[in-house]
Design a protein with these regions (language model features):
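Divalent metal-coordination and catalytic microenvironments
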Residues: 9, 28, 69, 103, ...
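Active-site-proximal beta-strand elements of phosphoester/diester hydrolases
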Residues: 66-76, 98-105, 151-155
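A short helix->loop->beta-strand "cap" motif at the edges of active sites that frequently abuts
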Residues: 18-23, 96, 130-132, 149
Length: 276
């Protein structure tokens, strides 16, 4: 995230901390360094009185008067996962509520070999039955997990890419009394607007562009019917300047086929001399 985003977030965490509201954060794959040369970003919260963090790629128990949070952050090394899960199981208390917090994929065995993925082992899913609630992060959509009645992904509270534009965003309110009650709270977030500029008739297409609905929006601009030479003459800044009040503008270039049926993907595979 940008410095501006980090600064804004810290101001909100300071407000929560000042109100003496306990707040627990666990590290995900994007906030976990892949080498020992980097420092975990969540370390900045160590000196906050009411913010508890778990980021060292190991199990951490966070205990209160009537509840224990069993936290398992993202793990880069799957070989260490079993020991950490067993530590978690050993700390389950029968006299308190037990909430498990993890950043991983549950039930997605097909991702086992993907770089940067931590997949929770299926032979340890029986531990979920010993928990009052299992709160998961990593996947960006809300949903229950498989046959488990107490295991949920809350999803992200904001879209993290344009591929996420159709998904509802929100958060979970979990109530642990006699039985678990899960309520999903949908929130209104900034819209994603898709605009198209036909580069066969660039000036007229720009003149007819409707930007009235792009204030504070995430905008995706499709430049269609591009040629290789024509694309060079349309810098990204020129297009982004058309949307001065948008929160973010991304540009997708769609090249039309040339007479010899070569496309953009072909350009990446041959030399410029051969292409032209």
């Amino acid at each position: 995230p940008s410095n501006r985003a980090i600064t804004f977030a810290l101001e909100q965490f300071l407000q929560i901390d000042s109100l003496n509201i306990p707040f627990i954060l666990i590290a995900g794959n994007h906030s976990t360094p892949r080498t020992n040369l980097s420092s975990p970003i969540l370390k900045i919260f160590e000196n906050f009185k009411n913010i508890y963090v778990s980021y060292n790629q190991e199990y951490k128990k966070i205990e209160f008067d009537d509840v224990i949070f069993h936290t398992l952050p993202h793990l880069n090394d799957d070989s260490k996962a079993l020991m950490q899960i067993e530590s978690c199981e050993a700390n389950i208390s029968e006299s308190k509520k037990n909430i498990m917090m993890m950043h991983c994929s549950v039930g997605a065995w097909y991702l086992m070999q993907e770089f940067g993925e931590w997949v929770y082992p299926s032979n340890k899913e029986y531990i979920f039955e010993k928990m009052d609630y299992v709160a998961l992060g990593h996947w960006h959509g809300f949903g229950a997990v498989g046959k488990h009645k107490n295991v949920y992904y809350s999803g992200s509270t904001e879209r993290t890419s344009l591929n996420d534009k159709r998904n509802s965003k929100g958060f979970i309110v979990a109530t642990l009394e006699d039985k678990l009650n899960i309520e999903y709270k949908s929130i209104n977030i900034r819209p994603i607007r898709i605009k198209e500029i036909n580069c066969d008739d660039l000036q007229d297409s720009i003149a007819n562009l409707d930007i009235s609905d792009t204030h504070d929006a995430i905008v995706e601009v499709k430049l269609t019917n591009l040629t290789a030479m024509g694309s060079i003459d349309i810098p990204n800044k020129q297009i982004k300047d058309l949307f001065p009040y948008a929160m973010n503008v991304s540009i997708k270039r769609e090249f039309k086929k040339s007479d010899d049926n070569q496309t953009l993907s072909d350009m990446e595979a041959i030399s410029l001399e051969e292409y032209f």
